[in-house]
Amino acid sequence: MSVENVLSLIQENEVKFVDLRFTDTKGKEQHISIPAHQIDADFFEDGKMFDGSSVAGWKGINESDMVMMPDPSSAVLDPFTEDATLNIRCDILEPATMQGYDRDPRSIAKRAEEYMRSTGIADTVLVGPEPEFFLFDDVKFATNMSGSFFKIDDVEAAWNTGTEYEDGNKGHRPGVKGGYFPVAPVDSSQDIRSAMCLIMEEMGLVVEAHHHEVATAGQNEIATRFNTLTTKADEIQIYKYVVHNVAHAFGKTATFMPKPLVGDNGSGMHVHQSLAKDGVNLFAGDKYGGLSETALYYIGGIIKHARALNAITNPSTNSYKRLVPHYEAPVMLAYSARNRSASIRIPVVPSPKARRIEVRFPDPAANPYLAFAAMLMAGLDGIKNKIHPGEAMDKDLYDLPAEEAAEIPKVAESLQQALQYLDADREFLTAGGVFSDDFIDSYIALKTKDVERVNVAVHPLEFELYYSV
């Protein structure tokens, strides 16, 4: 969409506000709303100044001025606001140079795509993430000196089979690990997901399917069509915005937290990816699983750098409560055709044009711009250095003998460990100036604060284990 198209859209839809949006390091959308009558063609040249020191992990107060530069191609009407509002995504620029800020996730994603093209390896990267989420009726939590707790409830939860309700307990609900594909009334989220899908399509996403996921208490997934890297990251931010707001409208609360429930599956964000050049899928070939040698090298790069990637693709302390065996979480750094216990799967596809890999360890807490860019950089490093991933593992990796399992590398065991790997293994990210050392240092510092806060927190389970010693 051009600037002229945006200005026409504002006029034709009697738009009252333009909502400028950007994504911070943690992956959360931020915004500022401007009366639409202030928007003209010059606005798309000059941008909007703002205080970058107020964004966690960004600039200090002594150099806080930054520019939000609206991208007219991202303009979309907001279906949730009372007054007609047009959302426009922004890149964050340095005012002195008007170049992308090195800590701006969207600018990093764009640089990753530019770097890929500069290598001559490929001109297009296609990304197809599958974020899962939970819908709850009620969530309470508190952390202070007097105590800590969280309490989740949902009418669909397996623990509510004996709960008394005013209009009676209807009994239909998925059990633990029993939520995959049952029809209503066991699946109580059908209409909510349908409403989400309709709004996602209204906002430009292509929805392929929606369904209940494995876990009890309202785990769900909506599958959307793949897209190029930065555009798909934009779409994931729209996806999350829609899920949160439709859930709210239905009297529910949505979370993309990787592991809100103990004892059932967590939420992942498997990421399908492939490279193309001149319209030809570079991952299709005659090697294992119908892959090309290029695809195998790409896998090799992902596996080699996986533990550093974990700091970005699994960026919360909670992420590592999901990455444990037997909850469909891929902890083994291996690849396989169809085998879902491997961290990288080669899906069955109807034609070579659709050949791709699926990286299964990421989760939806990840900043999509950073996660997709980091995986691309790891894959490109594998191709450039011809890193072969070794033999495929066509067996259930969860049931291997201990000696055999010990020989297979695994994902990082904690966020703290992943950050250490990122600190030591960063050159693949800084190639071509895509990620800067300054960004990586600031990212590690920001996430280390989370680790330190969790490490010193007194956990309720510690009272169960140790109160009576």
Curated annotation (Swiss-Prot):
GS beta-grasp domain location: 13-97
**Gene3D superfamilies referenced in this protein's UniProt entry, alphabetically:** Glutamine synthetase, N-terminal domain, Glutamine synthetase/guanido kinase, catalytic domain
- Annotated EC: 6.3.1.2
Q: Where in the cell is it found?
A: Cytoplasm
Q: Name one GO biological process term.
A: nitrogen utilization
O-AMP-tyrosine PTM sites in chain numbering? 398
Please list the GO terms describing molecular function.
ATP binding; glutamine synthetase activity; metal ion binding
User: How is the protein's activity regulated, according to its record?
Assistant: The activity of this enzyme could be controlled by adenylation under conditions of abundant glutamine.
Which positions bind Mg(2+) 2?
A: 132, 213, 221
The protein's job, in short, is: Catalyzes the ATP-dependent biosynthesis of glutamine from glutamate and ammonia.
- NCBIfam families named among the record's database cross-references: GlnA, PRK09469.1
- Assembly, per entry: Oligomer of 12 subunits arranged in the form of two hexameric ring.
Official protein name in the record: Glutamine synthetase
The organism's lineage is: Bacteria, Pseudomonadati, Pseudomonadota, Gammaproteobacteria, Vibrionales
